[in-house]
Amino acid sequence: VIGAFILLIVFYLMHKNNIKPIAISRFKALKKHIILIIGSIIMIYVFESFYQILMQFLPEKFQFNDTENNKDIAKMFTHGWLVPFLFLDIVILTPFVEELIFRHLIIHELGKKLTYGLMYIVSILIFASLHCVGAKSPFEIGPYIIIASMIVFVYHKTGRNLAVTITMHTINNAVSFLIMVMGL
């Protein structure tokens, strides 16, 4: 959480002269992308459900019910006093930080030097890989590739509007957070 705050402060200080008007215009453009955001989140769940069905055909040693990353996060919910901090981290900070890193830095900034298409792929693979550090099955990367691919698709379709992907990521994480809190 502290690292996330530091990253956000550094990003703000680097862009303090022009961040406010850009952020305002990008968030104002959100309205016209609501259907895309909601549709893409629904597609994430559809693709993940289909992926889970396909996992049943793998040898048992490669199958999994939940990713190790999700199991680790679920363990944190056993301490009730942590829930407000987890909300701040999972629903608020993480979408901002991950979108700044994976969409703004990797795609937007490196895409200027290399190609945007290549950086789309790099962003997806790094995002997914970092969410699977403790994975027991190599196929645990699948759900994260699905999530990252849909976010990158939305980022591309909206003309690389970071406000849209932050919102999409926030909604996706909020749904996951509610599922964890309700113990579903």
What are these regions (language model features)?
Residues 20-94:
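Juxtamembrane helix-loop-helix connectors linking adjacent transmembrane helices
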Residues 3-7, 40, 143-151:
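Hydrophobic alpha-helical membrane segments
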Residues 5, 9, 42, 77-78, ...:
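Polar low-complexity intrinsically disordered regions
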Residues 10-32, 106, 163-164:
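Cytoplasmic juxtamembrane interface segments
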Residues 15-20, 56-64, 132-136, 160, ...:
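Transmembrane helix-loop junctions in multipass membrane proteins, especially transporters and channels
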Residues 49, 80-184:
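Transmembrane helix-loop-helix hairpins at the membrane interface
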Residues 1-18, 68-71:
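Alpha-helical transmembrane segments in multi-pass membrane proteins
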Residues 4-7, 45, 173-176:
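Helical transmembrane-bundle signal
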